[in-house]
C-alpha cells in the first residue's frame, strides 16, 4: 500500500501499482459504458492532456494517434467542457500561478531596490490591467518589471580620473642622491623617537669627524706643498750657484791659457833677439 498526502484532506491510501483517482476528473465525464479502472479511460485522459496541455510523450497508443481525426478531437473537447474538466484545469493553473507569485515575492524581499517592483505588482493585482502583463506561449501572464528612472537620474555620476602627464614625469626624474634620501626618510619614519635621536647624533658626529679630517688633510697638504716649494727653491739656488762657478772657472781657464800663450810668445821673441 502507498500513502499519499493531500492538501486540506486526510491521507489517501491506495494499493501498489495503481494510479490515484484524485488526479482524474469526475466519473460522470466518461459517460455510459466507461469506468475509471478501464484502460480506455486512462488513454482518453492522456489524450486530453496531449491536446490541451501540449504534452508530448508515449502515454497513449500510436493506433489512436493515427486513427484520430479533427472531428473526434472536437467531440472529446465538448465532452470535457460539459463535464467541468476545463474548470478544474484552470483552477489548478490559478493555484500554480499564485504559488509562483509567492515564490517570486520571497526572492525579491532580500534584493535592494525591489520596492518599486512590489508596489507595481500590487497595483496590477488591484486594477487587473492586462497591459501590465506579458503573455507567454503557454498562455501564462508574467508581470512586467517597472524601472524607476527618476531614482536613476538622481544618482551621482562617477568622477573621471585626471589624465597623467607622462612627459612631465619623464622630465622630472629624481637623481640617485634624491632617491637615497627619500628611502632614508621613509625608513626613519618607521623608527621610534629614541632610535631617530640616536641616528641623528651618529650622523652629526660622522659629519663633524669628516669635516675635521678634511680640514686636517688640507692643512697637511698645504704644509707638504710649502716644504716642497722650499726644497725646490734651495735646489734651484744650488744649481744656479754651481752653474755660476762652472762658468767662472771656464772663463778663468780661458784667460789663463791666453796669458800663457802671450807670455810664451814674448819669450820666443826675446830669444831671437839674443
Swiss-Prot record:
Transmembrane segments: none annotated. GO terms for biological process: circadian rhythm; regulation of DNA-templated transcription. InterPro entries: LNK (IPR039928). Disruption phenotype: No effect on circadian clock. Residues 223-235 have a biased composition (Basic and acidic residues). Residues 209-249 are annotated as: Disordered. Induction: Repressed by members of the TOC1/PRR1 family of clock genes. Keywords: Activator, Transcription, Transcription regulation. Residues 236-249 have a biased composition (Polar residues). Interacts with REV8. Probable transcriptional coactivator. This is Protein LNK4. It comes from Arabidopsis thaliana (Mouse-ear cress). The gene is LNK4.
Amino acid at each position: 500500500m502507498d500513502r499519499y498526502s493531500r492538501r486540506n484532506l486526510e491521507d489517501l491510501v491506495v494499493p501498489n501499482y495503481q494510479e490515484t483517482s484524485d488526479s482524474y476528473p469526475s466519473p460522470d465525464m466518461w459517460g455510459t459504458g466507461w469506468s475509471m479502472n478501464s484502460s480506455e479511460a486512462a488513454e482518453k485522459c492522456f489524450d486530453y492532456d496531449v491536446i490541451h496541455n501540449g504534452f508530448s510523450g508515449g502515454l497513449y497508443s500510436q493506433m489512436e494517434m493515427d486513427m484520430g481525426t479533427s472531428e473526434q478531437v472536437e467531440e472529446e473537447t465538448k465532452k470535457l467542457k460539459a463535464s467541468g474538466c476545463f474548470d478544474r484545469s484552470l483552477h489548478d493553473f490559478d493555484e500554480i500561478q499564485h504559488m509562483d507569485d509567492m515564490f517570486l515575492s520571497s526572492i525579491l524581499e532580500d534584493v535592494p531596490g525591489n520596492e518599486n517592483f512590489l508596489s507595481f505588482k500590487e497595483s496590477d493585482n488591484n486594477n487587473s490591467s492586462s497591459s501590465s502583463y506579458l503573455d507567454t506561449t503557454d498562455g501564462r501572464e508574467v508581470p512586467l518589471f517597472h524601472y524607476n528612472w527618476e531614482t536613476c537620474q538622481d544618482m551621482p555620476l562617477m568622477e573621471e580620473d585626471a589624465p597623467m602627464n607622462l612627459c612631465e614625469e619623464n622630465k622630472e626624474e629624481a637623481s640617485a642622491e634624491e632617491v637615497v634620501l627619500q628611502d632614508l626618510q621613509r625608513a626613519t619614519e618607521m623608527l621610534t623617537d629614541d632610535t631617530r635621536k640616536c641616528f641623528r647624533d651618529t650622523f652629526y658626529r660622522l659629519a663633524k669627524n669628516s669635516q675635521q679630517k678634511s680640514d686636517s688633510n688640507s692643512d697637511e697638504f698645504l704644509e707638504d706643498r710649502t716644504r716642497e716649494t722650499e726644497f725646490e727653491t734651495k735646489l734651484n739656488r744650488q744649481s744656479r750657484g754651481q752653474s755660476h762657478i762652472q762658468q767662472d772657472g771656464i772663463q778663468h781657464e780661458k784667460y789663463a791659457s791666453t796669458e800663457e800663450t802671450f807670455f810664451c810668445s814674448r819669450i820666443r821673441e826675446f830669444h831671437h833677439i839674443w
